[in-house]
Amino acid sequence: LAVTMNDGLCLAVEVDSWRIQRRVETGYCDVMSDNLDEALDLLDKAEGGYSVGLLGNIADVMPELERRGIVPDIITDQTSAHDLRFGYIPAGYSLEEADELRESDPVKYDNEVLDSMVVHVQAILDLKKKGSVCFDYGNNLRGQVADHRDMPQAFDYPGFVPAYIRPLFCKGAGPFRWAALSGNPADITATDDALLELVPQNEALHRWIHKAQDKV
């Protein structure tokens, strides 16, 4: 959604079809596909912001993108890579097969996950060399392969906070969240409107809030 709200094209790879469908139903993703060629064709034909949730494993998909010479402008990863056992599905396994292996041989499962993470990170590094802007999103993907697979070069691409948020902190700007304990969506609109009045000069913030009100 953040990509499409900035008029970008997004290919989001997810191993669980239910999660993609849920995002489509709630408006966070435009369409689901289980075929890479179809997904790329949809993005190629899209006008304006558009997102495709591709059913697949990123450790398979990203090396294939690199092999085809497809270089995304931006790459990040939001798997729960900090949790080897339950946060990452190894390549070559369906969800059901992964569940069975996790139960029957957890050590093998962890090793399969780490092997997939190595492929995943190497593809990120390869695409970075070809021009993609890459960043980690604080999920420890880089740390897992650096610690368990002797891959220190994983840290050749930065974390999101040091690269992008910390400079904003230096300007006195940063993430700010609030909640309406009333449960009334109108109260969120009221706080949005108050913020727009408070900082009338911030065009980017105004654009973002108006788009969020339409989409979320």
Over which residues does each language-model region extend?
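Catalytic or ion-translocation cores adjacent to nucleophile or general acid/base/metal-coordination motifs
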Residues: 2-45, 77-122, 156-167
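Glycine-rich, aromatic-lined ligand/substrate-binding cores of catalytic
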Residues: 120-216
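Active-site/ligand-binding-proximal alpha/beta "capping" segment
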Residues: 51-79, 84-86
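General structural feature for long, well-ordered alpha-helical segments within catalytic domains
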Residues: 16-19, 35-42, 57-64, 68-71, ...
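Short coil/turn connectors at secondary-structure junctions
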Residues: 6-9, 47-49, 70-72, 129-132
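A structural signal for short, well-ordered beta-strand segments and their strand-loop junctions
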Residues: 12, 53, 74-77, 133-139
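Gly/Ser/Thr-rich loops at beta-strand to alpha-helix junctions
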Residues: 1, 58-59, 80-82, 138-143
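Short, solvent-exposed amphipathic alpha-helical segments in soluble enzyme
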Residues: 4-6, 66-71, 92-93, 150-153
